[in-house]
From Swiss-Prot:
Coiled coil: none
Provenance organism: Shewanella amazonensis (strain ATCC BAA-1098 / SB2B)
Name of the protein this chain belongs to: Small ribosomal subunit protein bS6
Biased composition (Basic and acidic residues): 104-122
Listed GO biological process terms: translation
Amino acid sequence: MRHYEIVFMVHPDQSEQVAGMIERYTGVITDANGKIHRLEDWGRRQLAYPIQDLHKAHYVLMNVEATAESVEELETAFRFNDAVLRSMVMRTKGAITEASPMAKAKDERDARRAAISERSSEADEVEENAEESAE
Protein backbone atom coordinates (compact mmCIF):
# COMPACT_ATOMS: atom_id res chain seq x y z
CA MET A 1 0.00 0.00 0.00
CA ARG A 2 1.08 3.54 -0.73
CA HIS A 3 0.77 6.78 1.20
CA TYR A 4 -1.37 9.63 -0.13
CA GLU A 5 -2.26 13.16 0.86
CA ILE A 6 -5.80 14.07 -0.17
CA VAL A 7 -7.34 17.54 -0.05
CA PHE A 8 -10.85 18.29 -1.19
CA MET A 9 -12.95 21.44 -1.14
CA VAL A 10 -16.70 21.31 -0.59
CA HIS A 11 -19.31 23.85 -1.67
CA PRO A 12 -19.93 26.19 1.31
CA ASP A 13 -23.70 25.57 1.19
CA GLN A 14 -23.00 21.86 1.82
CA SER A 15 -20.93 22.40 5.00
CA GLU A 16 -23.49 20.49 7.09
CA GLN A 17 -22.92 17.37 4.98
CA VAL A 18 -19.11 17.44 5.32
CA ALA A 19 -19.12 15.10 8.33
CA GLY A 20 -21.08 12.51 6.34
CA MET A 21 -18.81 12.92 3.35
CA ILE A 22 -15.72 12.43 5.50
CA GLU A 23 -17.25 9.31 7.01
CA ARG A 24 -18.12 7.94 3.58
CA TYR A 25 -14.68 8.69 2.09
CA THR A 26 -12.76 7.31 5.07
CA GLY A 27 -14.98 4.23 4.83
CA VAL A 28 -13.77 3.66 1.27
CA ILE A 29 -10.18 3.66 2.55
CA THR A 30 -10.74 1.51 5.64
CA ASP A 31 -12.94 -1.02 3.81
CA ALA A 32 -9.93 -1.76 1.57
CA ASN A 33 -7.76 -2.33 4.70
CA GLY A 34 -6.25 1.15 4.43
CA LYS A 35 -5.30 3.43 7.31
CA ILE A 36 -6.13 7.06 8.02
CA HIS A 37 -2.98 8.67 9.45
CA ARG A 38 -4.27 12.24 9.65
CA LEU A 39 -7.70 13.78 9.15
CA GLU A 40 -8.22 17.53 9.48
CA ASP A 41 -11.38 19.49 8.83
CA TRP A 42 -10.15 23.03 8.17
CA GLY A 43 -13.65 24.47 7.88
CA ARG A 44 -14.69 27.32 5.61
CA ARG A 45 -11.82 29.28 4.16
CA GLN A 46 -11.41 32.07 1.65
CA LEU A 47 -10.45 30.93 -1.86
CA ALA A 48 -7.50 32.52 -3.66
CA TYR A 49 -9.72 32.98 -6.71
CA PRO A 50 -13.44 32.42 -7.36
CA ILE A 51 -14.55 28.93 -8.35
CA GLN A 52 -18.05 28.76 -9.84
CA ASP A 53 -18.64 32.32 -8.54
CA LEU A 54 -17.87 31.17 -4.98
CA HIS A 55 -15.35 32.93 -2.76
CA LYS A 56 -15.29 30.42 0.11
CA ALA A 57 -15.13 26.64 0.41
CA HIS A 58 -14.98 24.01 3.13
CA TYR A 59 -11.55 22.32 3.17
CA VAL A 60 -10.70 18.77 4.32
CA LEU A 61 -7.22 17.20 4.49
CA MET A 62 -6.53 13.47 4.79
CA ASN A 63 -3.26 11.55 4.90
CA VAL A 64 -3.92 7.89 4.20
CA GLU A 65 -2.24 4.60 3.45
CA ALA A 66 -4.33 2.89 0.81
CA THR A 67 -4.40 0.76 -2.31
CA ALA A 68 -4.41 2.37 -5.74
CA GLU A 69 -7.88 0.94 -6.40
CA SER A 70 -9.41 2.58 -3.33
CA VAL A 71 -7.80 5.92 -4.25
CA GLU A 72 -9.24 5.62 -7.77
CA GLU A 73 -12.64 4.93 -6.21
CA LEU A 74 -12.25 8.07 -4.08
CA GLU A 75 -11.29 10.18 -7.10
CA THR A 76 -14.35 8.89 -8.94
CA ALA A 77 -16.55 9.73 -5.95
CA PHE A 78 -15.08 13.26 -5.89
CA ARG A 79 -15.65 13.68 -9.63
CA PHE A 80 -19.32 12.65 -9.48
CA ASN A 81 -20.18 14.58 -6.31
CA ASP A 82 -21.35 18.06 -7.34
CA ALA A 83 -20.67 19.41 -3.84
CA VAL A 84 -16.91 18.74 -4.22
CA LEU A 85 -15.52 21.81 -6.00
CA ARG A 86 -11.90 20.64 -6.26
CA SER A 87 -9.85 17.70 -5.08
CA MET A 88 -6.18 16.81 -5.18
CA VAL A 89 -4.56 13.45 -4.48
CA MET A 90 -0.78 13.34 -4.11
CA ARG A 91 1.39 10.33 -3.44
CA THR A 92 3.80 10.85 -0.54
CA LYS A 93 6.92 8.99 0.55
CA GLY A 94 5.64 8.10 4.00
CA ALA A 95 2.93 8.55 6.57
CA ILE A 96 2.44 12.12 7.75
CA THR A 97 0.88 12.23 11.19
CA GLU A 98 1.87 15.59 12.70
CA ALA A 99 -0.53 18.50 12.53
CA SER A 100 -0.46 20.57 9.36
CA PRO A 101 0.63 24.23 9.43
CA MET A 102 -3.05 25.18 9.02
CA ALA A 103 -4.06 23.18 12.10
CA LYS A 104 -1.12 24.51 14.12
CA ALA A 105 -2.05 28.10 13.25
CA LYS A 106 -5.67 27.43 14.27
CA ASP A 107 -4.56 25.92 17.60
CA GLU A 108 -2.32 28.92 18.31
CA ARG A 109 -5.13 31.33 17.43
CA ASP A 110 -7.55 29.46 19.71
CA ALA A 111 -5.00 29.48 22.55
CA ARG A 112 -4.50 33.24 22.16
CA ARG A 113 -8.25 33.85 22.19
CA ALA A 114 -8.65 31.70 25.31
CA ALA A 115 -5.87 33.61 27.07
CA ILE A 116 -7.43 36.96 26.15
CA SER A 117 -10.89 35.91 27.33
CA GLU A 118 -9.37 34.56 30.56
CA ARG A 119 -7.60 37.87 31.17
CA SER A 120 -10.77 39.85 30.49
CA SER A 121 -12.81 37.66 32.86
CA GLU A 122 -10.17 38.15 35.57
CA ALA A 123 -10.32 41.93 35.00
CA ASP A 124 -14.13 41.82 35.30
CA GLU A 125 -13.83 39.99 38.64
CA VAL A 126 -11.36 42.59 39.93
CA GLU A 127 -13.76 45.40 38.92
CA GLU A 128 -16.70 43.66 40.62
CA ASN A 129 -14.68 43.17 43.81
CA ALA A 130 -13.63 46.83 43.75
CA GLU A 131 -17.25 47.96 43.32
CA GLU A 132 -18.42 45.72 46.18
CA SER A 133 -15.73 46.99 48.53
CA ALA A 134 -16.57 50.62 47.62
CA GLU A 135 -20.19 50.13 48.69
